[in-house]
């Protein structure tokens, strides 16, 4: 077992240097250029909070996310490090079609996701999240996680269900990755959560049964990152989720899977022809 495999198995996450950080840097530059069209004086992504007020934040971020999705900047991070992720997850990979673009301003609890477990929201423990920052995430502004929680039963983490706000389903905030009916864990768990610093060109990789959360950004600079989910195409997962029937899309298939799909398609075509 490699060090990476051991860390994932025991802790529930690992921070790695991406073999090819170029798509992360390219995405960062693309996002900054997009924001500068409306904010020409924006020095860098870290300074975003000084340029956008609360009344415009969600709208601005949603517009930026749509550009991020249209340019397929998130899947490119996986695709241009494909050998690494195929060794980790398998040769048959699906990738999230619209990865989450995260923006957490300093001192804004409404921007950050509290501690949560994604399997409580319909995700599968077979899924892997790749958190790739576009700005440095030092300890004071980092995501937090509970070591070993990915192996514990749901009974160890009871939650309190909040009602869905009217009009929240399918809203820009919902599509940005904020739950419309949050399932809140015990706030006392924060004492067990540790910060996970991640630099630009690195990625935090974790399974979705891990208890984690952004928490309040206690730093002085805005935290921008991509949260890209990938899954083995042969794992028992739903490819659609919530308001998105194409939540996962194919990224790559092994030669065996390609041959199998052609065989199955040929049989289906022959069966359809016989029925006419």
Task: Report residues per predicted region.
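Extracellular structured ligand-interaction cores
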Residues: 13, 96-98, 125-131, 140, ...
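A general structural signal for short secondary-structure junctions and capping/turn motifs
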Residues: 5-7, 119-124, 134-136, 195-197, ...
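Conserved, charge-rich beta-strand/loop surface module that forms ligand/interface-binding patches
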Residues: 127-172, 245-275
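Conserved double-stranded beta-helix
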Residues: 82-146, 151
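Non-heme Fe(II)/2-oxoglutarate
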Residues: 35, 210-276
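N-terminal auxiliary "cap/dimerization" subdomain that precedes the catalytic jelly-roll/cupin core
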Residues: 1-94, 195-199, 266-276
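Active-site rim elements
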Residues: 70-72, 188-192, 215
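Double-stranded beta-helix
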Residues: 140-210
